[in-house]
Every structure is written in structure tokens, then in C-alpha cells.
């Protein structure tokens, strides 16, 4: 029950509010300030018909018309608007005026209505001043302003492919507005078009001209022959008159003018002009303005409540917000009306207005040759021109070029081998060689040092190009020595502006007509200059120095790895040890057979086993010290096979390492991992601001590599190439043509990997240059005739040099001392080792000799001691003999002497003379034998003192024999034999 009460109360309140709103929505007064009764009548009829059009008028909504006549006096117009329109609470005003009365009266209506925020829709005012919303705050118009014709100019220039124009305009508001519109719109318009029109010259004049000759003389110096003119009808007559006198309305000149100039009474034949469709159809514009207003009010009613319009001009405090909102709704309208598609821009100016393209024929006849109209399918304006119906100046049917084609051109080039070689002229030189062309450098103040001569691939191309398409030229070098890149520069001290430097900057700023150089075609440059078809196709590649195999002192060890060498060394000694053990423990190796010959081979010792193992490995003859046992000899045969394989493998690999050709490159190309992940020991670079630099900046996948190489980039390619040769730079990334030339010239350089970033070299020209097509056609003919191939062979590939490089690569490397120095050093080490060992042996031997001497001294002392003992024994024996002798004298017969010696006490005597043997001879002989000896120095034989010695005593006796005689000075010895009795 409570819910039902709440629902009914809510429904009653909403219904009451809706009823009040409908009562308020019931009537809307539309004011009209019109020029004549026909317009007023048509205005009333249109509103009457509108009330029955349910598409635009909601139920219970009715429109009423309130009209006044436009007065030429703007003050009266203001009073009429206040007293006859605003007092009637008009929600909007439609205003028109006569073209001859000026725009003061419509401006008065706009000021007055705008003060109270009442929207005003103009149907005839086209002055640029009404676009200023600071003054005309609530003014819209169903006709476009005059300066919107600049949009149609751009479409026409694009259709005719004119790229350079001269703009002629008056210095009033509309004249400057059309220039600003052209310049502003062209910046965005040409983003979608290939051909960009540039303003070569702007000629501004004061209205109400009396003469235009001075301006025409100045215009003749320009290259463009396309004139876009905004002028009043009176000023246009003066301009056309003087242009005819200067022959500037003849063949080759193109005049495109606005509506006012088109109606001059002396408009030359061939002039193209614009005529707004429905420009004088007040009835059509009245209807469209009323329906636009009804459409806006309908949408506003559905969204919000419209407050009552102001009623009193005397109330200055009135602020009608609904009027401001209604003005915003009006600007968003887009309907199809009697005058075409009706829509507005932010300034309230009509867009999508249609124009007829008028061609002036003989006797001032106007002929429509095209239309600029709204395309419903594409929802935008579209230009259609029938070129075949146009009669151009000089009664020509063929479209003029639109520019004066100069036959003497200013050309620029840059030093880049082999395309352009630059040679400074000597002090005594006045002319270049026949194959050279003068190319001065104009950025130096030294007048004696700026004369150069240029030759090369591009110079030969230029000479042939000039002959083919018939032009003369002045050639100069790039002022800053750069191809050019797009950088930010501070021009005025407060603003930064991006502009081109180098050759591109000279061309963009029109300081040169053509660039003849190895200029890479890329999107950044093509946006600002024209390119011919490529005269040489190329790409980007990498230049590096060929990797040379380092010849160290151990180059002969390169065939085997260190591990293999160690294994071979270990194997030699392991095999030697096993051979020794096998031969030692074999029953046929350690012991000799019982019936064997005494000359049988000795068993293998460890030293001989090592000698055998090395001898087999080094293939030296082994004469002795071979294994004796069968098991050891089997191992020896296996070791010999191993040695044969090792030596053969070493020999083959040595030839591969030292004789065969070197590896080509270190890098595999741009995708080499060492480039993508640049290491500290691998440096790569290109030239700053070059096309290659731009390429790397464009490629996202190369961004990491570019950040690394950016700090290493060089100012010139020449400097970078020199650093590659010196080994300071490992990889230089540059145009393939230049790098292939460098590689063909120097056998130590090589290009790595495949080409990437393929493009071409083209001739650079200004945007819209008349020479572009001619140069392109000539280059295509050169390709077909083989002329470009001839230039390639002559300047880039250097066939004979490249052939020498190939011969050098295929020829085996000759081994030199550097390659095999290690072997000689090894021999030297062996010799030094042998000398060292012999020195060690000598030192060791001296040590042994000293030791032996000490042993000999000790042995001599021992022998001397033993000798002393023997002497004592001998003395005792002598005494015993003497006693026996004395006894014998007493017992034996005279004439005999007994010399018997005890065998046990005199073993030496017994060995020589036998036991119990008497000395033969008489007493005289005994006496001779008993003579004293003179003992000389050590090592000398003893001498007999006095008388001739016995034959036996004259000889040097061995030590053993000398000891047979008793010592002379033994105690108890006497030589006196006088007591003997014979």
C-alpha cells in the first residue's frame, strides 16, 4: 500500500513537470534580417513547412518567424534588432546582406546578438573577420569564408602535381588569412600525399593597386611559374594588365585565382578560378540555416531544458546560458541541405562547401572543367577535374610544367672513394685533368686553398648525364663535409627547430639544385628531397681485417692440442717402463742360456728402453738395446704402429696449419652473437648521422647493438677504415659499395657476412624538381646500355687487383723462420742441454777425482804403514840371516854363502826365487847388490851410488820388486862385508 502511494505521487510530480516543459517548449521565435521581400517570404514559407516536418520538429513544438529588412546603416540595423527581434524573444537570427553593401550591417547584427548570446547564422557573409570568435562570439555561416579557397588550391596543386608556387595576396585580413590557411593546411595535408607543394615566393600588395610591374619583375627571378592569387576584382584587373605587358600570361605560365579575381574584365585566357556553388542562392541558404537551427534545438530539448531567450536590450546583466549551449549544438550539425552537405568547424564556418573549377576561355567565357564536392561514400571532399577540357595559357592543351627549367645547375658532391676522389690543385695548376672536374670548397676563407679537382665514379656519371639531358653545371664540395642528418638547432635563441645539415640541408634550403654523390635513398631523406632511380644498388655490410694466424715460437706444436702432446709424452715413458719390465721379468730376457754364446745380446735396461721408445717414435735407427723377450717385442711392434700414426697425423696437420689458406673472416654477419651482445674486446662503429646510423636507429632489434656502438662512431668513413687497417677497430659497418672497393684494393681487408639493409644510391634533387624525371630516365638507359656496369668495373671492383688477391689467397703460405723458429730453438735447446749435461758431468767427474785422490792418499798411508811393518820384518830377517851366515861360516866350506831366507817371513822372495833357494853368484856380485841406493823424488827410480850397477839394478823395478831388497837404513843393517871370508 505504501509503495502504491509513493508510485502515484511520483508519477503526478513527473507528469506535472513534463506538462510545464511542454508548455514551455511550445513556441520558438526565429528572427530574420534579410535583404528583400522575396527572401522574407521564403523565410516565412520555410518555417511554415518546418512545423510540419516531424523529423526536425517534436510534437507540440512550433516555430514562428520574426523578420526585419537589412539596412545599409549599421546603427539602424542595431536598433531594429533590439526593438523588433530581441523584444520578441528570438532564439536565433538568420542574417543576409547585399554583396555591394559591405559587411558592416551583418557585423552589427552579430555584435548585438552576440552580446546576449543569441546565435546568428549568416548566409552571405564570407569575410575572414567573422571567424574571430573573440569578436563574433555566436556567429555561424552556411557559406565558407574566402580564405577557405586555400583548401581547394591544395587539391588542385596535388592534382596537377605542381610542387612550387608563388602566392600573390592583398595585405588585408582576408589576404593574410588565405596565406596562413594555405601554409597551415599544407603541413597536415601533405602527410598523406606523395607530392608536397612549397611556396617559393610570397608577394603581398596593398589593396587598390595602381601598378604591379615591380612585383612582376621580382617574380620573374623565381623558378616557379604557378601563381596563386587572392585579390579583389579591381586589383586583379591591374595585376592582369601588367602581367600581360611582362609576357607572364603566355605559354608556360599558370594562374589559379579566387572568386573575386575571376570576374575581372581582363582575365587572361587559360586562367583557372573557383566559383562557390550556390553562392547567390539565398533561398537555399535560408532553408539550410532554418533546418540546421531546428536540428540543434531538437537535440537540445531532448538533453536539457532551454531557458527563455532575453527580451530587453537594456538589461546588460542578462546572461543567457541556453544561448551559449545552443551555439555549441549548432556547431555539431551535419545535415544534407539544398546547398550540399552542411557542417561547421570550431569557428562556426561552413565546411564541405562545393566549388566549380572555372577555366577562362576566349572572350572571357567561363567553362566549368571540374568540381570540388562532397563524396558521401568517403565522407570527405573530392576533386574531379577533366584535364582534356582545360585550355591553358597560350591556347595550349598540354599541361605546363609549372616551373622555369634552368639549364645551368648548382651541383654539390662529397669526397667518398671510389665514387668521388678529391685532389687539391697545386699552386702552379690552373686546370684539372681531362677526367676531372673543378669542385671548389666555398666554406674556407683561404682563397688559395679552396680549389680542388674531383674524379671518380660519380664524376663520370655526371659527365655522361649532362651530355644526355643537356644541362651545364657548377660543381662544389659539401661545405661541412657531411651527407647530412636531421638535428635540433637553436635558431632564435629561444626555440629549438629540427633541420638538415650537410648536403641534404643545402638541397632543402635551395642552395643547390642537385647532389651527385653516393647518396643513400632512405625514408628520412625522401620526405624532404627527391631521389632519382638508383644508379647503384647496394646494402650495408661489415669490413674487418683478415684474421692472420699468429706464428709463435711453438707454431710447430699447433697440429696437436696440449692434451694430446702431454698424452704422447706420457705414453713414451710408460711404454719404455713396460718394455723394461717385460724384458726383465721374462725368462728369456733376464738370464742367459747355459749353452749361449758369450757374445749374446745383453738384457734391456731402463735407459735402453727409454732410448728405444723415443727412437721408434722419432723414426731413428735403433742398432742396439732392443727388447729380447717376445712379449716386449710385441709391445714394441704395437708402439711402432702407434708412432707411425702419430707422426703421419702430425705431418698432415702441420701442413694444414702452416701451409693452407687462412680463414676468411672472424664475424659471420650482422646476426653474429658477438655483435648483438657486444663484448669489450670487440669494437664496431659506423659514421655519425649517416644513412647507416639512421638505419640502426630505426631497427628495434638492433637497438642494443646501436647503443654500444654509438659512442664509437666516427666522423668520416676514411678515418674508420684506417683504424680497421691498424687493428684499432674490429668491425666497420658501412655501405657495401665502398667496403667492397676497399676489400678489392687491400688484400688484408675482407667484408663479412651477407648484405643487409638493402637500398641504393640515387641522385638527390629538390622537391618537385623538373629534372627528376629526366635524370631517372637517363639512369635507366645507362643501366640498359651497360654504362653503369662499366663504371663498376672501372672504379669499384678493380678487376686486376681483385684477381691478385684471389691468387694470393690460393697460393700456399711459404714457411719462414718465424713459422719454424720453434724447431730451431728446440735444436738449440737440445745443444744447450747437451752442453749443460757435459758441464755437469765434468763437474761431477772432478768431484769424483778429488774423492778418489783422498782415497788414494789414505790407501798410500796404509801402504806406507804396511811398508814400515815389512821393513821391520826385513831387518829382523837380515839379522837372522846374518846370524845364520855367521853360523854358516863356522860350519861350511869356504867359497859358499848361504842366502837362505825364511819362506814365511819373506813371501815375495819365495814367490820369485822359490823356497830354500840360495842366491847364485860370488861375493863380489853380492857386494854390488848391496851397494846403497839414492832415493830420489817420489815417482823416480832409485839410483845406485858409486860403481857400475848390476844389470838388474839399472832398470826401474816395480814397487813390488823394490820391496824385495832390505832397506838400506833399516835399524841393525850394515854394509860392511869385510868380515866375510871367501
UniProtKB/Swiss-Prot annotation:
The UniProt record lists the keyword Mitochondrion:
no
**Where does this protein have compositionally biased stretches of type Polar residues?**
972-982
Transmembrane regions: 562-582, 640-660, 820-840
User: Which GO cellular component terms are attached?
Assistant: NMDA selective glutamate receptor complex; postsynaptic density; postsynaptic membrane
Annotated glycine binding sites: 518-520, 525, 691, 735
Query: How does the protein associate with the membrane?
Result: Multi-pass membrane protein
Q: Which residues form the signal peptide?
A: 1-16
Keyword set includes Glycoprotein: yes
Q: Which residues lie on this side of the membrane: Cytoplasmic?
A: 583-639, 841-982
CDD domains from the UniProt entry: PBP1_iGluR_NMDA_NR1, PBP2_iGluR_NMDA_Nr1
Q: Where is this region: Disordered?
A: 934-982
One Pfam match: CaM_bdg_C0
Instruction: List glycan-bearing residues.
Output: 247, 303, 334, 386, 443, 470, 490, 681
Q: Which residues lie on this side of the membrane: Extracellular?
A: 17-561, 661-819
GO BP term, pick one: long-term memory
Which keywords does this Swiss-Prot/TrEMBL entry list? Calcium, Cell membrane, Disulfide bond, Glycoprotein, Ion channel, Ion transport, Ligand-gated ion channel, Magnesium, Membrane, Phosphoprotein, Postsynaptic cell membrane, Receptor, Signal, Synapse, Transmembrane, Transmembrane helix, Transport
Q: Where in the cell is it found?
A: Cell membrane; Postsynaptic cell membrane; Postsynaptic density
The molecular function terms of the Gene Ontology recorded here are: glutamate-gated receptor activity
State the function annotated in the UniProt record: NMDA receptor subtype of glutamate-gated ion channels with high calcium permeability and voltage-dependent sensitivity to magnesium. Mediated by glycine. This protein plays a key role in synaptic plasticity, synaptogenesis, excitotoxicity, memory acquisition and learning. It mediates neuronal functions in glutamate neurotransmission. Is involved in the cell surface targeting of NMDA receptors. Plays a role in associative learning and in long-term memory consolidation.
The family classification in the record reads:
Belongs to the glutamate-gated ion channel (TC 1.A.10.1) family.
Q: Please describe the quaternary structure of this protein.
A: Forms a heteromeric NMDA channel with Nmdar2.
Instruction: Please report the name of this protein according to its UniProt entry.
Output: Glutamate [NMDA] receptor subunit 1
Species this chain originates from: Drosophila willistoni (Fruit fly)
Lineage, highest ranks first: Eukaryota, Metazoa, Ecdysozoa, Arthropoda, Hexapoda
Amino acid at each position: 500500500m505504501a509503495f502504491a502511494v509513493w508510485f502515484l505521487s511520483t508519477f503526478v510530480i513527473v507528469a506535472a513537470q513534463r506538462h510545464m516543459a511542454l508548455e514551455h517548449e511550445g513556441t520558438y521565435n526565429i528572427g530574420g534580417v534579410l535583404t528583400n521581400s522575396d527572401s522574407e517570404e521564403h523565410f516565412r514559407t520555410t518555417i511554415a513547412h518546418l512545423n510540419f516536418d516531424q523529423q526536425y520538429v517534436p510534437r507540440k513544438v512550433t516555430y514562428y518567424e520574426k523578420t526585419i529588412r537589412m539596412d545599409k546603416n549599421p546603427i539602424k540595423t542595431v536598433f531594429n534588432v533590439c526593438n523588433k527581434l530581441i523584444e520578441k524573444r528570438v532564439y536565433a537570427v538568420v542574417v543576409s546582406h547585399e554583396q555591394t553593401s559591405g559587411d558592416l550591417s551583418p557585423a552589427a547584427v552579430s555584435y548585438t546578438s552576440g552580446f546576449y548570446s543569441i546565435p546568428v547564422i549568416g548566409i552571405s557573409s564570407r569575410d575572414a573577420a567573422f571567424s574571430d570568435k573573440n569578436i563574433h562570439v555566436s556567429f555561424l555561416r552556411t557559406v565558407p569564408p574566402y580564405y577557405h579557397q586555400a583548401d581547394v588550391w591544395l587539391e588542385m596543386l596535388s592534382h596537377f602535381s605542381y610542387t612550387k608556387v608563388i602566392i600573390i595576396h592583398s595585405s588585408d585580413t582576408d589576404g593574410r588569412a588565405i596565406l596562413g590557411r594555405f601554409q597551415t593546411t599544407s603541413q597536415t595535408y601533405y602527410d598523406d600525399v606523395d607530392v608536397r607543394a612549397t611556396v617559393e615566393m610570397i608577394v603581398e600588395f596593398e589593396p587598390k593597386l595602381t601598378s604591379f610591374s615591380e612585383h612582376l619583375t621580382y617574380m620573374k627571378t623565381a623558378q616557379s611559374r604557378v601563381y596563386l592569387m587572392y585579390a579583389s576584382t579591381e586589383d586583379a584587373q591591374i595585376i592582369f594588365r601588367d602581367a600581360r605587358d611582362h609576357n607572364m600570361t603566355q605559354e608556360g605560365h599558370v594562374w589559379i585565382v579566387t572568386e573575386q579575381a575571376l570576374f575581372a574584365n581582363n582575365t587572361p585566357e587559360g586562367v583557372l578560378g573557383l566559383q562557390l556553388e550556390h553562392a547567390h542562392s539565398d533561398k537555399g541558404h535560408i532553408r539550410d540555416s532554418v533546418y540546421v537551427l531546428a536540428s540543434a534545438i531538437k537535440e537540445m530539448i531532448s538533453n536539457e531544458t532551454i531557458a527563455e531567450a532575453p527580451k530587453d536590450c537594456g538589461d546588460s546583466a542578462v546572461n543567457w546560458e541556453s544561448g551559449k549551449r545552443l551555439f555549441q549544438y549548432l556547431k555539431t550539425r551535419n545535415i544534407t541541405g539544398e546547398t550540399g552537405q552542411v557542417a561547421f568547424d570550431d569557428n562556426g564556418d561552413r565546411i564541405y562547401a562545393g566549388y566549380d573549377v572555372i577555366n577562362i576561355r576566349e572572350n572571357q567565357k567561363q567553362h566549368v572543367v571540374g568540381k570540388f564536392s562532397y563524396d558521401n561514400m568517403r565522407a570527405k571532399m573530392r576533386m574531379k577535374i577533366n584535364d582534356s577540357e582545360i585550355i591553358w595559357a597560350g591556347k595550349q592543351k598540354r599541361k605546363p610544367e609549372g616551373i622555369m627549367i634552368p639549364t645551368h645547375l648548382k651541383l654539390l658532391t662529397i669526397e667518398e672513394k671510389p665514387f668521388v676522389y678529391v685532389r687539391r690543385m697545386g699552386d702552379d695548376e690552373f686546370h684539372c685533368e681531362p677526367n676531372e672536374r673543378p669542385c671548389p670548397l666555398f666554406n674556407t676563407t683561404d682563397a688559395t686553398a679552396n680549389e680542388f679537382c674531383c674524379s671518380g665514379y660519380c664524376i663520370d656519371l655526371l659527365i655522361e648525364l649532362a651530355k644526355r639531358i643537356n644541362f651545364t653545371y657548377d660543381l662544389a664540395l659539401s661545405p661541412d663535409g657531411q651527407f647530412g642528418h636531421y638535428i635540433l638547432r637553436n635558431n632564435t635563441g629561444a626555440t629549438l627547430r629540427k633541420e638538415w645539415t650537410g648536403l641534404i640541408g643545402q638541397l632543402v634550403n635551395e642552395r643547390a639544385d642537385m647532389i651527385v654523390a653516393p647518396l643513400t635513398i632512405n625514408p628520412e631523406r625522401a620526405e624532404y628531397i627527391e631521389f632519382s632511380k638508383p644508379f647503384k644498388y647496394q646494402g650495408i655490410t661489415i669490413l674487418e681485417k683478415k684474421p692472420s694466424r699468429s706464428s709463435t715460437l711453438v707454431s710447430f706444436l699447433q697440429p696437436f692440442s696440449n692434451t694430446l702432446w702431454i698424452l704422447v709424452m706420457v705414453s713414451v715413458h710408460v711404454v719404455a717402463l713396460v718394455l723394461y719390465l717385460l724384458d726383465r721379468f721374462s725368462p728369456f730376457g733376464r738370464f742367459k742360456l747355459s749353452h749361449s754364446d758369450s757374445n749374446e745380446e745383453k738384457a734391456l735396461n731402463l735407459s735402453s728402453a727409454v732410448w728405444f721408445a723415443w727412437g721408434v717414435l722419432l723414426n731413428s735407427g735403433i742398432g742396439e738395446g732392443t727388447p729380447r723377450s717376445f712379449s716386449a717385442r710385441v709391445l714394441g711392434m704395437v708402439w711402432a704402429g702407434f708412432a707411425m700414426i702419430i707422426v703421419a697425423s702430425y705431418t698432415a696437420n702441420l701442413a694444414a696449419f702452416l701451409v693452407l689458406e687462412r680463414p676468411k673472416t672472424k664475424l659471420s654477419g650482422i646476426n653474429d652473437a658477438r655483435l648483438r651482445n657486444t663484448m669489450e674486446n670487440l669494437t664496431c662503429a659506423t659514421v655519425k648521422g649517416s644513412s647507416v646510423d639512421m638505419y640502426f636507429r630505426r631497427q628495434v632489434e638492433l637497438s642494443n647493438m646501436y647503443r654500444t656502438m654509438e659512442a664509437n662512431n666516427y666522423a668520416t668513413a676514411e678515418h674508420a677504415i684506417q683504424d680497421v687497417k691498424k687493428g684499432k677497430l674490429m668491425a666497420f659497418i658501412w655501405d657495401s659499395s665502398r667496403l667492397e672497393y676497399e676489400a678489392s684494393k687491400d688484400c688484408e681487408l675482407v667484408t663479412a657476412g651477407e648484405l643487409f639493409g638493402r637500398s641504393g644510391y640515387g641522385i638527390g634533387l629538390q622537391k618537385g624538381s623538373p629534372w627528376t624525371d629526366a635524370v631517372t630516365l637517363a639512369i635507366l638507359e645507362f643501366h640498359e646500355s651497360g654504362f653503369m656496369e662499366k663504371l663498376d668495373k672501372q672504379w669499384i671492383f678493380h678487376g686486376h687487383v681483385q684477381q691478385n688477391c684471389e691468387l694470393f689467397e690460393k697460393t700456399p703460405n711459404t714457411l719462414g723462420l718465424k713459422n719454424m723458429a720453434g724447431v730451431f730453438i728446440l735444436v738449440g735447446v737440445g745443444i744447450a742441454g747437451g752442453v749443460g749435461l757435459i758441464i755437469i758431468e765434468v763437474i761431477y767427474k772432478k768431484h769424483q777425482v778429488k774423492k778418489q785422490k783422498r782415497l788414494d792418499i789414505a790407501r798410500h798411508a796404509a801402504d806406507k804403514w804396511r811398508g814400515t811393518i815389512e821393513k821391520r820384518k826385513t831387518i829382523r830377517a837380515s839379522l837372522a840371516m846374518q846370524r845364520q851366515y855367521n853360523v854358516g861360516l863356522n860350519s861350511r866350506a869356504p867359497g859358499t854363502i848361504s842366502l837362505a831366507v825364511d819362506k814365511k817371513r819373506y813371501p815375495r822372495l819365495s814367490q820369485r826365487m822359490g823356497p830354500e833357494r840360495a842366491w847364485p853368484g860370488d861375493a863380489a856380485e853380492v857386494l854390488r847388490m848391496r851397494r846403497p841406493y839414492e832415493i830420489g823424488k817420489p815417482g823416480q827410480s832409485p839410483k845406485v851410488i858409486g860403481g857400475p850397477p848390476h844389470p838388474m839394478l839399472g832398470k826401474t823395478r816395480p814397487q813390488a820388486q823394490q820391496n824385495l831388497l832390505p832397506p838400506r837404513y833399516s835399524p841393525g843393517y850394515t854394509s860392511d862385508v869385510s868380515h866375510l871370508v871367501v
